[in-house]
Amino acid sequence: MKNKFFYKKQFTNIYKKQSKLSETTSQVLYGEKFEILSKNINWLKIKTSFDNYIGYIENKNYSKSHLVTHKVFVLRANIFDNFKKKTKNYLPFASKISVMEVKGNFIKFEKNKWIKKTDIKKINHIEKDYLKILKI
């Protein structure tokens, strides 16, 4: 079962075994691509595209399509609902998003989910100022 999928929540742990009590070995971030190696009702065995890491995640919060246009370029990009009210949620550095709409200083990346325009860069952006990277 070799398919490409994208994770659609903030992030989740990758476990060594099919249990939340198992050792956490890595994480999958919002918009990160992965391949499903096997699946059952509650768990997916995956291989991440970024670093080829293999492990288990819960069988939820993923989709087959995701047109990535930008990446989060701050440690934590706060998520706002209706681009006015800050929520407790955030997207971590390197999360990959699709810009759906732009309003003022905010971009919409999902229904009722907005982040500040200054928190993202185009997906193909390469930072040449290494001091700027170290400040992140």
Question: Positions of the model-derived regions?
Answer:
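SH3-family beta-barrel domains
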Residues: 1-19, 27-30, 37-40, 47-50, ...
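Second-shell loop/turn segments in exported
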Residues: 136
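Long hydrophobic alpha-helices with heptad-repeat/coiled-coil character
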Residues: 120-122
